[in-house]
């Protein structure tokens, strides 16, 4: 199953996160949906690597969804209910 991301806000995150999200809109348009290569979730931050983009982006600037027979369905990358392999936890509990 493919996970998609769409820029939802250019006001979230640090200034460089905001500028990176705005650059995506400037380059591709506000309605563009991007295929997700990987999502990296750490203890206090998370990043998304988009297919055909070299850099990673802060996930706070995106909405995520999967495509279903009834159309797009919002997807919670932190709960990852379908166990999508493109979502990786980069931290490990030590207890």
UniProtKB/Swiss-Prot annotation:
Record protein name field: Uncharacterized 11.2 kDa protein in segB-ipI intergenic region
